[in-house]
Swiss-Prot record:
Annotated segments matching region Disordered: 568-591
Gene3D superfamilies for this protein: 3.30.420.40, Actin, Chain A, domain 4, Substrate Binding Domain Of DNAk, Chain A, domain 1
Induction text: By stress conditions e.g. heat shock.
Protein name: Chaperone protein DnaK
C-alpha cells in the first residue's frame, strides 16, 4: 500500500494551487480542466455547488457566486446563497474539498492530510479559520505556514548555511504583500510585513477593460459597460492580453460579434501595446512602492542589506513590475520558479518533510529510454537516445519561441513518444534574464550529462549573458523492464497518430470557442437581427457541433475556414457601414 501523501495547498484570494512531493521534488497537480491553478470561486446553482473555472465563468450571470472569500476569513460575516447563510470557512472548505478530491484522483490514493499556506500578516483568528476550513473539507491540517516562508522553502533557501535577509514581493490576483524574512540554520523568522489587500492582477484587468470600453464607445458610440455578456468577454480578453504582454510588445484583441447596431453585428479589433498597457496601469504599479519602503523601515533594513528578492504571484510576470522591484532594491529579483506555483510547492516541501519524503535530489532510475526536453508545440526533442552508453554528454542549441521572450522553461523528459505530454517528466526549471530579441535570435545551450553512477545533470545556458541554470536527477523514475518495453512499444505504435493528435485537438478547441462566441452573440442580439440571420447562424453552429461530436476533423477544418471567411466579411461590412454612417460620425464628434 502506498504511503499516504501530505499535500501542500496555496489557498489564494483569486487562485488556489495544490502540490505534492513526487521523487523528492514538489510537483503541481492539475485540476479536472487540465489547469495548474484553480480560481478561488464558488457558485451555487439549483443546490449544486460548482468550484473553480466553471464557477468563475458564471460570475457575471449568476448572483450566487462568491469570489475573494479569503479576505473574510476570521470574521463573523456570512454570505447568503440561495436563501441560506454560509460562513467564510464553509465557502473556503468547498475550494479545499474540490482540490482534495482532484488530488486523490490524480494520485490514485486517499488524501486526508495537508499543509495550507496563509499570508504572514494573518492573525490567530484568520489562521484558525483556515484550519477549520480544512477540517470541514475532510482534511487533517498538519501545519499552517506563512506564504513567504513557503516561497523560501520552494527555492531551497532553508539549506543556506549563512544567515540571510530575504524580501518576498507577492503580487497576486487580488492582494499585494511584502514580507521580509531572516533565514539561518533552517529557521525562518518573518520580521516585517506590509501590503495592500485591494491591489492585484484583477485591477490591471479592469484598466484594460476600461480602455477597451472607451475605444468601442469612441468608434461605435455604444456603451457596453452595463452589458453582462459583453463584459464577461471583455474581461476574458483583458486577462489574456495582460498575460501575453508579459512576453510580447503588443497583442491583437479580437471581439467578433461583441454588439449589434442598426447596421448589424459589430466585430471589434484593436492592438494594445506594452507601452500603452504600462501607461494605463502605472498608478497600480506605483501603489506597490510604499509598502516595500514600509516593510524595509519596519525591519530596519536598507535595500543593500537584502540578500535575495523572491517574486511570488502571477502579476509579478508584468515587466513593469519586475523593473520597479529591480530599481527599488538595486537587485535582480529571483523568478526562476513559476510565481503562481511557488507557494504551493513550498507547502508541499513542508508536507514532504513531515511525511519523511524529502531528499536533496530528484531520484530516478537510469533506463534505456531517450532523454530530452519539451520544445515549441509540445514536441519532445531528444538529446540522448535510448541505449546510449554511459557516461555520456550531449549539447544542442535552442532558441526562443516568441519575440522578446524573457525566460525559457526547460521540461526534462524521458520516453520515446513524439509529444511531450505522452512522455515522463523528470523535472522542470526556468532560465531567466534573456535579453529582448526577436524570436529565434537568442542562443540557449542545453546540455545533458550522465555520469557513471547514472546521475543526470541538465543545464541551460544563455550564450549571450552566460546566465545558467542546472537540475540534477538520479534514478529515472523507478521504471521496471516491463514498463520500459511498454513505453518503447507504445512509441512505435503511435508514431503517426502522435503527429495528428495535436492538430486535431487544437482544431476542436478552436471550433468550440467559435461556437461559444456565436451563441453568446445571438443571445445578446435578441431582436436586433432577423430570424433568417439567426437561423443561418444557428445552422452553422449545429453543423460544427455535429462535426466535433463525430470527430470528423477533415470536414471540420473546411467548415472552420468557411466560418472564418464569413466572420471576416461580416466584420468588414459592419466597419464600412459604421464609417459611412453620418449619424455615427456626428455622435462621435459630440462626445
Amino acid at each position: 500500500m502506498a504511503k499516504e501523501k501530505i499535500i501542500g495547498i496555496d489557498l489564494g484570494t483569486t487562485n488556489s494551487v495544490v502540490s505534492v512531493i513526487e521523487g523528492g521534488q514538489p510537483i503541481i497537480l492539475e485540476n479536472p480542466e487540465g489547469q495548474r491553478t484553480t480560481p478561488s470561486v464558488v457558485a451555487f446553482k439549483n443546490s449544486d455547488i460548482i468550484v473553480g473555472g466553471a464557477a468563475k465563468r458564471q460570475a457575471v450571470t449568476n448572483p450566487n457566486v462568491v469570489q475573494s472569500i479569503k479576505s473574510k476569513m476570521g470574521t463573523t460575516s456570512k454570505v447568503n446563497l440561495e436563501g441560506k447563510d454560509y460562513s467564510p470557512e464553509q465557502i473556503s472548505a468547498e475550494i479545499l474539498r474540490y482540490m482534495k478530491n482532484y488530488a486523490e484522483a490524480k494520485l490514485g490514493q486517499k488524501v486526508t492530510k495537508a499543509v495550507i499556506t496563509v499570508p504572514a500578516y494573518f492573525n490567530d483568528a484568520q489562521r484558525k479559520a483556515t484550519k477549520d476550513a480544512g477540517t470541514i473539507a475532510g482534511l487533517q491540517v498538519e501545519r499552517i505556514i506563512n506564504e513567504p516562508t513557503a516561497a523560501a522553502l520552494a527555492y531551497g533557501l532553508d539549506k543556506q548555511d549563512k544567515e540571510e535577509t530575504i524580501l518576498v514581493y507577492d503580487l497576486g490576483g487580488g492582494t499585494f504583500d511584502v514580507s521580509i524574512l531572516a533565514i539561518g540554520g533552517g529557521s525562518f523568522d518573518v520580521i516585517a510585513t506590509s501590503g495592500n489587500n485591494k491591489l492585484g492582477g484583477d485591477n490591471f484587468d479592469e484598466e484594460i477593460i476600461k480602455w477597451l470600453l472607451g475605444k468601442i464607445k469612441a468608434e461605435y458610440n455604444i456603451d457596453l459597460s452595463k452589458e453582462k455578456m459583453a463584459l464577461q468577454r471583455l474581461k476574458d480578453e483583458a486577462e489574456k492580453a495582460k498575460i501575453n504582454l508579459s512576453s510580447q510588445l503588443e497583442v491583437e484583441i479580437n471581439l467578433p460579434f461583441i454588439a449589434m447596431n442598426e447596421s448589424g453585428p459589430i466585430s471589434f479589433a484593436t492592438t494594445l501595446t506594452r507601452s500603452e498597457f504600462n501607461k494605463i496601469t502605472k498608478h497600480l504599479v506605483d501603489l506597490t512602492i510604499q509598502p516595500v519602503k514600509d516593510a524595509l523601515s519596519a525591519a530596519k533594513k536598507t535595500p543593500s542589506e537584502i540578500n535575495e528578492v523572491l517574486l511570488v504571484g502571477g502579476s509579478t510576470r508584468i515587466p513593469a513590475v519586475q523593473e520597479l522591484v529591480k530599481s527599488l532594491l538595486n537587485k535582480e529579483p529571483n523568478r526562476s520558479i513559476n510565481p503562481d506555483e511557488v507557494v504551493a510547492m513550498g507547502a508541499a516541501v513542508q508536507g514532504g518533510v513531515l511525511a519523511g519524503e524529502v531528499t536533496d535530489i530528484l531520484l530516478l532510475d537510469v533506463t534505456p529510454l531517450s532523454l530530452g526536453i519539451e520544445t515549441m508545440g509540445g514536441v519532445m526533442t531528444k538529446l540522448i537516445e535510448r541505449n546510449t552508453t554511459i557516461p555520456a554528454k550531449r549539447t544542442q542549441i535552442f532558441s526562443t519561441a516568441t519575440d522578446n521572450q524573457p525566460a525559457v522553461d526547460i521540461n526534462v523528459l524521458q520516453g520515446e513518444r513524439a509529444m511531450a505530454a505522452d512522455n515522463k517528466s523528470l523535472g522542470q526549471f526556468q532560465l531567466t534574464g534573456i535579453q529582448p530579441a526577436p524570436r529565434g535570435v537568442p542562443q540557449i545551450e542545453v546540455t545533458f550529462e550522465i555520469d557513471a553512477n547514472g546521475i543526470v545533470s541538465v543545464s541551460a545556458k544563455d550564450k549571450n549573458t552566460n546566465e545558467e541554470k542546472t537540475i540534477t536527477i538520479s534514478n529515472s523514475g523507478n521504471l521496471s523492464e516491463a514498463e520500459v518495453e511498454r513505453m518503447i512499444k507504445e512509441a512505435q505504435e503511435n508514431a503517426a497518430n502522435d503527429e495528428v493528435k495535436k492538430k486535431n485537438i487544437e482544431l476542436k478547441n478552436k471550433a468550440e470557442n467559435y461556437i461559444n462566441i456565436i451563441e453568446n452573440s445571438l443571445l445578446q442580439a435578441g431582436d436586433k437581427i432577423s430570424a433568417e440571420q439567426k437561423e443561418q447562424s444557428q445552422k452553422m453552429v449545429d453543423e460544427i457541433k455535429e462535426l466535433v461530436k463525430n470527430e470528423n476533423y477533415e470536414a471540420l477544418e473546411q467548415k472552420m475556414a468557411e466560418l472564418e471567411q464569413a466572420m471576416a466579411q461580416a466584420a468588414e461590412f459592419a466597419n464600412k457601414q459604421n464609417e459611412s454612417d453620418p449619424n455615427n460620425n456626428s455622435s462621435e464628434q459630440n462626445n
